[in-house]
């Protein structure tokens, strides 16, 4: 539901001066309710409690692993997070030129879909590991994030180029890696296989970096 002041009511979608409904499902999606109902019925009271505990435990595990390098934006009085955590990425822009978008794109080279970007805090990454992730998978993700942190430090320390680097050029699709032209000061190995475990089950993205704003407006 959306609440507005009385003087704005006539401008709501499909009213006197409003625009057409912008949602493809203006009355909602009943399928979402069926999924939620099935999830609750299959888990039961004990299962729901246990899965919630595991989700919170997983999020706090990642926060403990990454807090000293990235920093955690919000924590409770005990220093813990809920079922998700927000990684601080805003300082990197000043020290290396790297943005939260660069980190999200680089994660694709490690085989991970980008986490929630710049929400609810601009310039951050919000990560929600959920209850189903194994310790091994959490450790792999932690390793990826720490390696990306090291890549940022390489830029800060002058080891990597300020603009032509693995972060700002990420992601690296297969056609780029196997192509004849390679105009980067870093190796194809570092671009495509930044960690040993990546090569074991490499997930290739289809395209290189795109203009996010243009894509949101036109695709």
Put a short name on every predicted segment.
Residues 1-63, 67:
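Mobile "lid/hinge" segments at catalytic clefts and subdomain interfaces of large enzymes
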């Amino acid at each position: 539901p959306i609440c507005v002041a009385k003087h704005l009511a006539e401008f709501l979608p499909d009213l006197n001066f409003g625009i057409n409904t912008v949602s493809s499902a203006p009355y909602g999606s009943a399928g979402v309710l069926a999924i939620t109902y099935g999830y609750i019925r299959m888990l039961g009271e004990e299962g729901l409690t246990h899965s919630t505990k595991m989700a919170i435990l997983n999020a706090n595990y990642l926060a403990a692993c990454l807090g000293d390098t990235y920093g955690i934006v919000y924590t409770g009085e005990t220093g813990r997070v809920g079922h998700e955590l927000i990684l601080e990425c805003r300082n990197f822009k000043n020290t290396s030129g790297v943005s939260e978008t660069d980190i999200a794109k680089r994660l694709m080279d490690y085989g991970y879909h980008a986490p929630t970007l710049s929400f609810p805090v601009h310039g951050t990454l919000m990560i929600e590991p959920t209850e189903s992730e194994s310790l091994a998978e959490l450790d792999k993700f932690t390793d990826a994030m720490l390696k990306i942190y090291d890549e940022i430090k390489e830029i800060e320390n002058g080891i990597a180029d300020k603009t032509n680097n693995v972060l700002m050029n990420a992601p690296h699709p297969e056609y780029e890696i196997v192509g004849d032209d390679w105009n980067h000061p870093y190796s194809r190995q570092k671009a495509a296989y930044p960690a040993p475990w990546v090569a074991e089950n490499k997930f290739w993205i289809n395209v290189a970096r795109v203009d996010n704003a243009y894509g949101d407006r036109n695709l």
